[in-house]
């Protein structure tokens, strides 16, 4: 990984909720989606059901020179909607297991600094894009 970006949703009250992270290689090609723990990103916890609604019609708004980046990220969110939802369900299952093993509440698990990353899912670029063009049911 050369770098990564975090995608947030801004609530009506201005509070940020983390949707997902995207790791990038040195050329800027996507490597993996990831779901960090809440203490890593701060803000409000985004439930999987809410994330599912947001991923049905992602709407990233950037103006000026970053408008193209917003379009690219929006297309990636659409392309990877199903894998992202699967990753978030796996995140929730990992939190449940951690709570059971450690005797924690979900709120305590989300602030447990021993856990930085709950789940990730790989991106196989450009193979995934070709599969989407060819109609693979894995994508939108």
Task: Tell me the role of every PLM-derived stretch.
Residues 7-11, 83, 128:
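Generic signature of intrinsically disordered, low-complexity segments enriched in small/polar residues
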Residues 125-140:
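Charge-rich, low-complexity intrinsically disordered segments
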């Amino acid at each position: 990984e050369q770098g990564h970006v975090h995608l947030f949703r801004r609530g009506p009250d201005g509070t940020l909720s983390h949707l997902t992270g995207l790791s990038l290689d040195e050329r800027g090609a996507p490597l993996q989606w990831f779901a960090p723990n809440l203490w890593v990103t701060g803000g409000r916890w985004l439930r999987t059901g809410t994330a599912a609604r947001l991923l049905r019609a992602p709407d990233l708004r950037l103006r000026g020179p970053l408008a193209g980046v917003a379009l690219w990220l929006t297309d990636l969110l659409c392309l990877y909607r199903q894998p992202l939802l699967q990753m978030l369900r796996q995140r929730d299952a990992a939190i449940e297991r951690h709570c059971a093993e450690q005797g924690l509440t979900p709120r305590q698990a989300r602030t447990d600094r021993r856990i930085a990353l709950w789940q990730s899912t790989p991106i196989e670029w450009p193979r995934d894009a070709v599969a989407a063009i060819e109609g693979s049911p894995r994508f939108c």
